[in-house]
Amino acid sequence: MIESQRHSYHLVDPSPWPISGSLGALATTVGGVMYMHSFQGGATLLSLGLIFILYTMFVWWRDVLRESTLEGHHTKAVQLGLRYGFILFIVSEVMFFFAFFWAFFHSSLAPTVEIGGIWPPKGIGVLDPWEIPLLNTLILLSSGAAVTWAHHAILAGKEKRAVYALVATVLLALVFTGFQGMEYYQAPFTISDSIYGSTFFLATGFHGFHVIIGTLFLIVCGIRQYLGQMTKKHHVGFEAAAWYWHFVDVVWLFLFVSIYWWGGI
């Protein structure tokens, strides 16, 4: 089939992973509902579904890397399509966080009588934005600079320097996550403390989840860079990770300014 191909696009071979991922998602959904309603076997089905999804993700991405690195299917046209696809994914993530910011500003700009007609709600002790939040902002911005350093190193063909930069990025990301967990532990309010607690923990919590995903993404890129699987002309995976990380940086800046600083006044 490859010999008769007269175009630069990758026609993927039949794969079992889409159907296995669908079955894992079904098991996770049904198991989650059963678990929340205390049905017997719900926790087991939920766990199996999550394991199935994680396994499918691992082997599917493994196959994509094989098609790219070992089989040479990722031509310039395919790489361009992957870039467009990831840009659309980031746009969908923007809409995702837009919903949380909408909920926050809807509640804070016109506080209802149920929360005392003021913002922050009456009885809520807010966090000082100039302590851990400001430190985390500096850490995350530094990690963004480090991933840009890694990108320039890859483009310059300096493989070891790119690995060092990615290690620095991952370490800064881990420090950020640790401080965020410390902040949650010390927070004087919980997710059930009025709309303030709900919007705070949902927005910052999902951002933290994205930081963890981005950290794993960068770890994989660092391993691939160490193994010599990325070149200055072929590093779409790293570009996607860098775009994702810069998106995480920008979201955090909006969170810091709106929720921590303005919303805590």
Curated annotation (Swiss-Prot):
Keywords: Membrane, Mitochondrion, Mitochondrion inner membrane, Translocase, Transmembrane, Transmembrane helix. Its EC number is 7.1.1.9. GO terms for molecular function: cytochrome-c oxidase activity. Signal peptide: none annotated. It is a multi-pass membrane protein. Component of the cytochrome c oxidase, the last enzyme in the mitochondrial electron transport chain which drives oxidative phosphorylation. The respiratory chain contains 3 multisubunit complexes succinate dehydrogenase (complex II, CII), ubiquinol-cytochrome c oxidoreductase (cytochrome b-c1 complex, complex III, CIII) and cytochrome c oxidase (complex IV, CIV), that cooperate to transfer electrons derived from NADH and succinate to molecular oxygen, creating an electrochemical gradient over the inner membrane that drives transmembrane transport and the ATP synthase. This is Cytochrome c oxidase subunit 3. GO terms for biological process: aerobic electron transport chain. It is found in: Mitochondrion inner membrane. One of its GO terms (cellular component) is mitochondrial inner membrane. The gene is COX3. Pfam families: COX3. It comes from Triticum aestivum (Wheat). The keyword Nucleus does not apply. It catalyses: 4 Fe(II)-[cytochrome c] + O2 + 8 H(+)(in) = 4 Fe(III)-[cytochrome c] + 2 H2O + 4 H(+)(out).
